[in-house]
Design a protein with these regions (language model features):
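One-carbon transfer enzymes
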Residues: 1-190
């Protein structure tokens, strides 16, 4: 069984959706929540779901040996970034080649890169009058939001949609597609 670590900086709704979706699955399960913020609500979600969690700050991530050891101690095979706002260290990408994925709240390459996360993305989408938005699930590479695309799903927008409306449409796509995509990646092909 593949053991997953989910990296989160905030609320953790995608973490919870993935954990619940994989519950009872024989191919993969969420074994660890890693948050860089001690006040992240995701830590409470992990406690409620019975998932072990660890606060691992930017300073902790700067220590390659300790970070790799922490993940090794938990037998982590795969990493999912779900609202994780730190840049993933290069050493981690090299240690987990094609085993780290991210979800981005836009149709990359639009609205990607440094500073483009959460409502920053949705505000830019609204400001530019986009007719659609969506999600991109991709492998993590050394280029911010530049890894190979696994899945893109779009949703139409109306000029009347507010930033909150856009965010809600994107959250619905995340909820529907992110857990299924994680399982699909980790399910052995026949």
């Amino acid at each position: 069984m593949k053991r997953i670590a989910v990296f989160v900086s905030g609320n953790g709704s995608n973490f919870e959706n993935i954990t619940r979706f994989l519950h009872g699955n024989y191919n993969a399960h969420v074994a660890l929540l890693v948050s860089n913020r001690p006040d992240a609500y995701a830590l409470q979600r992990a406690s409620r779901l019975g998932v072990e969690s660890v606060v691992w700050t930017k300073t902790d991530f700067a220590d390659e040996q300790r970070t790799i050891q922490m993940l090794t101690d938990h037998n982590i095979h795969f990493i999912v970034l779900a609202g994780f706002l730190l840049m993933v260290p290069t050493y981690l990408i090299r240690h987990f080649p094609n085993r780290i994925i991210n979800i981005h709240p836009s149709l990359l390459p639009k609205y990607g890169g440094k500073g483009m996360y959460g409502n920053h993305v949705h505000e830019a989408v609204k400001e530019n009058g986009e007719k659609e938005t969506g999600i991109t699930i991709h492998y993590v590479s050394e280029v911010c939001d530049g890894g190979e695309t696994i899945l893109q799903v779009s949703t139409p927008l109306s000029p009347l949609d507010s930033v909150d409306d856009i965010a809600e449409k994107v959250h619905q796509l995340e909820k529907e597609y992110f857990p299924k995509t994680v399982l699909e990646i980790l399910t052995p092909k026949k």
